Amino acid sequence: MRQIKKLLTVTLVSLTVLSGCSLPGLSSSSGDGIAITSMTTTESQIVSHMSRLMIEHYSEGEIEPVMINNLGSSTIQHNALLSGDAQVSGARYTGTELTGVLNKNPESDPDVALKQTQEAFDQDFDMKFYDSYGFDNTYAFMVTRETAEEYNLETTSDLADYTDEFAVGVDTSWFNRPGDGYPAFQEAYGFSFGNIRAMQISLVYEALSTGSLDLALGYTTDGRIPAYDLVVLEDDLQFFPPYDASPFATHAVIEKYPVIDEALSRMIGTISTETMQNLNYRSDEEGIEPALVAEEFLKEHNYFEEEGE
C-alpha cells in the first residue's frame, strides 16, 4: 500500500508540472518562492539537497527553498522551471539535456557538450547551466565479475557474440529514446539483443547480482557497482554521450538572489565520480536518507566555511 501511495504521489506531481499548473504549496509564501527540483534517482536527490543546504547556509537562513522530489524526467524538471513552479534544479546532465530538452544531436566530447548545453539554455530559456560538479554519470553496460571472466568480456563490442544468450535489462526511459537510446545503439554497434526488457533502472543491479539478468545497462556512479562487484564494460565505440552533472538555475532567480549563484558555484568541480558513487552507496545500500547523506558530506568537507577560514 505504501508503494502504491508513493506511485500515486509521484504521478500526481509529474502530471501537475506537465500540465503547467502550479504545484500545491509553491506559492511565493513558501521558501521565499524558491523551489528546487530533483528526479527519482538517489543521486539527483542527494545533490539537490546539497543545493538546498548550501542556499540556506549562505543566505543565513533568509532563503529556505522547498523541494519538488521524484520528478520522472529531465523534461518534467525543465517544465517546472519554465512554468515558474521551480527556479533551481539540483542535477541536470549534459547528454540528457542535449538530446532530450534541447533536441540536439549527441556529442561525444565533454567540453563541447557542456558548451553547447550552456549556450542553448542561456540563449533560448534565460537559464544558467553551471559547470560540472566534477562527475560524469553516463550509461554503461555491466555484468557480474563471474560473467566477465567466463565470457572474456571487456568492451561493449564483445557482447556481439552473445546477443541471443544473455537476458538484458535496460532503463525504461532509454529503451525508446531518440538520439542516444536503444534504436541508435543498435545502429552504432550493429547488433540488437534477443532477450531485452525495459525496467526501472534502480532494479537492474540486484537483478544482475542474483542472476535474474546476465547483462544490464546502468549508471556509472551507482554505488551498487562496487557493492555487487560488477564489471563495467568499456563503451569502445564511444556511443554514450557524456552525462556531466551540473546545478541549474534561472537567471531571474540568481539576479534577484545573487547568494544562490554563490552557493551553487561553490560546489563546482568538487565531487568526483568515485565520491558520488560512495554517496549513492550510503543511501541505496546503507539506507541513509539522501538529505542526511548530503548534510553529512557538506559538513565533513567544510562546505559551510567561508573562503579563507
Where are these regions (language model features)?
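Short helices/loops that flank or line small-molecule/ion binding pockets
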Residues: 54, 75-86, 102-104, 183-188, ...
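Ligand-binding "clamshell"
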Residues: 100-109, 115-130, 212, 224-238
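An extracytoplasmic/periplasmic, membrane-proximal ligand-sensing/linker region
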Residues: 43, 177, 188-191, 265-309
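Bacterial N-terminal signal peptides that target proteins for export
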Residues: 1-8
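A bilobed periplasmic-binding-protein/Venus flytrap-type ligand-binding module shared by bacterial periplasmic
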Residues: 138-149, 244-257
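Bilobed "Venus flytrap"/periplasmic-binding protein-like clamshell domains
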Residues: 31-71, 134-205, 288-292
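C-terminal motif of bacterial Sec signal peptides marking the signal peptidase cleavage site
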Residues: 17-20
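Bacterial signal peptide processing site
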Residues: 22-25
